[in-house]
A protein has these predicted regions:
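Glycine-rich phosphate-binding active-site loops on the catalytic face of alpha/beta enzymes
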Residues: 169, 223-225, 290-304
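N-terminal secretory signal peptides and thylakoid transit peptides that target proteins
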Residues: 1-18
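Active-site-adjacent beta->alpha loops and helix N-cap segments on the catalytic face
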Residues: 113-127, 147-148, 171-185, 253-254, ...
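C-terminal segment of N-terminal export signals and the immediately downstream linker at the start
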Residues: 25-59
Length: 329
């Protein structure tokens, strides 16, 4: 525990020293110097709210800790991720998030993409019970047509404050005209006191849910620009599905931005860095300027403080200048 506490003290001092500073783009910059211990340790992370739950505008994503990094054709990366993110490293990362004002993480309920080794629930329980961790958990769930509630119930039983339907499931059910299944899943989530959401990679999902008047608390929709070298050219993008090379998750950013300007529900944008292909300064700015209320970002421990500072500075600037879509508080 001493190692974590020493890091906690360092983070408090360095965050105080960083107040008012803006980081240049990228994660590969040197750490800011630690300031005097007597300085204020408060980090003013912008906050929002989804129904009754207060949530930091930057949310810690969960793909990295299960080894799901969308590594394209780099076959060693998933194993590297799983070896890096030991239980203690996950705990350390969440603790750093709390130090930096990030009060919420998103993580799966026994993800089928975790190679049978999803640590999320086990480590979250350890973090809360053994370390006194207070980070909130919004659970990514995997309802099935023959079992809508089992995965959701596991999230409820393990202390989640919210739950949403996995994006691939949301895409598939809307494509197959099963909005009714999504509505039933949301109803079960809300009945148990959690905030309910739907994730998706296709803008057709929130369009269909809004048209049907489905009672959902928030949307999780991908948003990133196509200004990176491995993005699929527009002429080659499928009309409805994602490109086949695991390299792009928002094929219609302009349409997504335009649609959400007319949506009054909170929007958590994810894949805002195109799974590591876009610099944080650029990706965060694109997401928040274009209407996202929250950003879900997978982070290594050494990226947390940089991303927190970038988020704070970009949102402060946007709130001074304004943006076309109002913030959903």
């Amino acid at each position: 525990m001493a190692g974590f506490l020493n890091r906690r003290g360092f983070i408090k001092r360095s965050l105080a020293a960083s107040a008012g500073l803006t980081l240049p783009a990228g994660h590969n910059k040197p750490a800011l110097a630690a300031g005097p211990a007597e300085q204020s340790t408060n980090f003013d992370m912008p906050m929002g709210k989804i129904r009754h739950v207060g949530i930091s505008r930057l949310i810690c994503g969960g793909n990295l800790i299960i080894g799901s990094a969308h590594e394209r054709d780099l076959i060693y990366v998933a194993s590297l991720m799983r070896h890096y993110f030991t239980d203690n490293k996950i705990i350390e990362t969440w603790q750093l998030c709390e130090e930096c004002g990030i009060n919420t993480m998103i993580g799966p309920v026994n993800s089928p993409y975790a190679f049978g080794e999803d640590p999320t629930i086990r480590v979250y329980n350890r973090y809360c019970k053994e370390w006194g961790g207070q980070i909130q958990w919004i659970a990514q769930t995997y309802p099935k047509t023959y079992d809508l509630t089992g995965s959701i119930q596991m999230a409820i039983d393990n202390g989640a404050v919210g739950a949403f339907v996995h994006g691939g499931i949301g895409d598939n059910w809307v494509r197959n005209n099963r909005v009714d299944l999504l509505a039933k899943a949301f109803e079960f989530i809300k009945k148990n006191g959690l905030i309910a959401g739907c994730a998706c990679h296709s803008i057709e999902v929130p369009i269909a849910l809004e048209k049907a008047g489905v009672d959902v608390d928030f949307y999780m929709n991908t948003l990133h620009s196509d200004d990176y070298w491995s993005a699929t050219p527009k002429a080659e993008r499928p009309e409805h599905d994602l490109p086949p090379h695991d390299n792009m998750w928002c094929t219609k950013p302009e349409q997504t931005i335009e649609f959400f300007r007319g949506v009054s529900k909170p929007w958590i944008a994810f894949k805002i860095l195109a799974a590591g292909a876009i610099q944080p300064q650029k990706g965060f700015k694109f997401a928040f300027e274009n209407g996202a209320d929250f950003a879900n970002v997978g982070m290594f421990d050494f990226q947390v403080r940089h991303d927190a500072i970038i988020t704070r500075d970009i949102i402060d600037e946007i709130k001074r200048k304004g943006r076309p879509r109002p913030w959903m508080e």
